[in-house]
């Protein structure tokens, strides 16, 4: 096993841990989930570049008769990238005392100001940061509003 294979195993393990945390652990942290809303995905250009580069590496490894283990590891990395970028949907998860946004826990008392833009983006101003929440379904904004009013 080469150093390249070890690095690939490390990246695959990191992506797998992230996917498991995002899918199974995060919704169970900090109490019961009150509301979970699907968000719009960001631009997919980065993901296309990543998966494309991994596909080029797979092709290069196969044509140069590289190690079969490396080909399988590159394929697993491409599948993990495909899952994380295209199959998994980003979510905002509301709890009793706060919410998870982009895998970060934010307490409700940190929200200083909230606005709704014309194009349906909920803008939350925190102490030093602005959150732009783009929901998949525009009707979910009303659910978020009701939940925030009930918990304030």
Swiss-Prot record:
Signal peptide range in chain numbering: none
Transmembrane segments: 6-26, 45-65, 67-87
Chief subcellular location: membrane
Keyword set, alphabetical order: Cell inner membrane, Cell membrane, Membrane, Transmembrane, Transmembrane helix
Compartments (UniProt record): Cell inner membrane
Pfam families associated with the record: DUF986
Membrane topology: Multi-pass membrane protein
Keyword Membrane: yes
Cellular component aspect of the GO annotation: plasma membrane
Family label: Belongs to the UPF0266 family.
Name of the protein this chain belongs to: UPF0266 membrane protein YobD
Organism: Salmonella paratyphi A (strain AKU_12601)
